[in-house]
Amino acid sequence: MHKKLYISDVTLRDGMHAIRHQYSIQNVQDIARALDEAKVDSIEVAHGDGLQGSSFNYGFGAHSDLEWIEAVAEVVKHAQIATLLLPGIGTIHDLKAAYDAGARVVRVATHCTEADISKQHIEYARSLGMDTVGFLMMSHMTTPDHLAIEAKKMESYGATCVYVVDSGGAMNMHDIRARFRALKAALRPETQTGMHAHHNLSLGVANSIAAVEEGCDRIDASLAGMGAGAGNAPLEVFIAAAERLGWHHGTDLYRLLDAADDIVRPLQDRPVRVDRETLALGYAGVYSSFLRHAEIAAKKYGLKAVDILVELGKRRMVGGQEDMIVDVALDLKRREARA
């Protein structure tokens, strides 16, 4: 394969979920510096739930998005700074502030059937001259053909790249291939595609490889898999696999290995791995960032987190419905009392 893959690191955004959005300024600078020296193309920086995600519903961050972005801007020389915006949480005013702080790439994220709410934000990002990406979350919850229709909407608003986002880590390689084939058939040849995997079924790297084989241009990954649930595709593992396949990625594998083990892994207060709870996310198709919230609810109400997660999957809950986790826990508690 001759084209260079665009390597998009998400350790400082999706990785926020793994430590409940508590990175210090020193942490983000250490991680960003290591990623920059390893020559990744972009480094995404924000609260785990995007600009202005810091809240009662999602959890308060140790710092503001702008403090984190400005801190990263001080140390990077090669990589572009990316950020995430969920319409309804972040606004175009927040996007402008992020741009002023140093962000040059924005991923505008919606549920996979709600691309129409991204129009204002994508158009505004393009007017700022940002690298503007559409991000279709929970892509397993709709058909490949419908996902392509939603991707086409984002393209029409001005997105120059659209992502298949496996937020629940619920898809396999066949699911990924079907979605990329549908997107490639619907989108203009010049519109790029990207893959954002989660590792809940241990398929994060395999799914990313399948995506590239179907023509995907950009791959999201994180150091040591640092991310929601069982984490994202581990960056150093994907790069090692890409190297074995002879793919052009432009990054320094050994620097990534050192950063993953020496800087990122020691920060994990809960191991980022496939275990009973994170496997339940992938099996039940649940939004990966529900994990820590469900574990807190389970402890509070004397339940098993896995039972809460499976019930959330049955109810087809999506990102943004974190408040329903307590509702589900109370329902399960009532059921238990009646039994």
Swiss-Prot record:
Domain of life: Bacteria
Any one Gene Ontology BP term: L-leucine biosynthetic process
CDD domains membership: DRE_TIM_HOA (cd07943)
Site annotation Transition state stabilizer: residues: 13
Binding annotation for substrate: 13-14, 167, 196, 287
Catalytic reactions of this protein: (S)-4-hydroxy-2-oxopentanoate = acetaldehyde + pyruvate
GO molecular function: 2-isopropylmalate synthase activity; 4-hydroxy-2-oxovalerate aldolase activity; manganese ion binding
Binding site for Mn(2+): 14, 196, 198
Residue intervals of the Pyruvate carboxyltransferase domain: 5-257
Matches recorded under Pfam families: DmpG_comm (PF07836), HMGL-like (PF00682)
SUPFAM superfamilies given in the database record: Aldolase, post-HMGL domain-like
Active site (record annotation): 17
Alphabetized UniProt keyword annotations: Aromatic hydrocarbons catabolism, Lyase, Manganese, Metal-binding
Assigned EC number: 4.1.3.39
Family, similarity comment: Belongs to the 4-hydroxy-2-oxovalerate aldolase family.
PANTHER family (alphabetical): 2-ISOPROPYLMALATE SYNTHASE 1, CHLOROPLASTIC-RELATED, HOMOCITRATE SYNTHASE-RELATED
Protein name stated in the entry: 4-hydroxy-2-oxovalerate aldolase 1
